[in-house]
Amino acid sequence: SDSKIGNGCFGFPLDRIGSVSGLGCNRIMQNPPKKFSGE
């Protein structure tokens, strides 16, 4: 599938799990999870 999020960012392709868990490469770069931001 082409619609992968953070495709190969951690050495393996992430799908919707990246979106939901905030583990997607794009998620971390553009919008870091608040729980990791210190909230």
Swiss-Prot record:
Keywords tagged on the record: Disulfide bond, Hypotensive agent, Secreted, Toxin, Vasoactive, Vasodilator
Q: What's the family?
A: Belongs to the natriuretic peptide family.
Q: Please give the InterPro entries that the UniProt record associates with this protein.
A: Natr_peptide, Natr_peptide_CS, Natriuretic_peptide_brain
Please tell me one Gene Ontology term that the record gives under cellular component: extracellular region
Give the UniProt tissue specificity note. Expressed by the venom gland.
Q: What is this protein's name? A: Natriuretic peptide TNPc
Q: What are the cysteine partners in each disulfide bond?
A: C9-C25
Q: What else is known?
A: Has a high stability. Is highly resistant to proteolytic degradation, due to its extended C-terminal tail. A high percentage (72%) of this protein is still present in human plasma after 24 hours, in contrast to human atrial natriuretic peptide (ANNP), which has a half-life of less than 3 hours. In addition, it is highly resistant to the metalloproteinase and serine proteases tested, in comparison with ANNP.
What is the role of this chain? Snake venom natriuretic peptide that exhibits vasoactive and hypotensive activity. Produces a near complete relaxation in pre-contracted aortae by activating the natriuretic peptide receptor 1 (NPR1). Stimulates cGMP production through the natriuretic peptide receptor 1 (NPR1) with high potencies for the rat NPR1 (EC(50)=100 nM), and very weak potencies over human NPR1 (28% activation at 10 uM). In vivo, reduces both systolic and diastolic blood pressure with no effect on heart rate, when intravenously injected in conscious rabbits.
| Transport found in the keyword field | no
Q: Name one Pfam family in it.
A: ANP
Q: Its Gene Ontology molecular function terms?
A: hormone activity; toxin activity
The record's Gene Ontology biological-process terms are: regulation of blood pressure; vasodilation
The cellular location(s) given in this protein's UniProt record come to:
Secreted
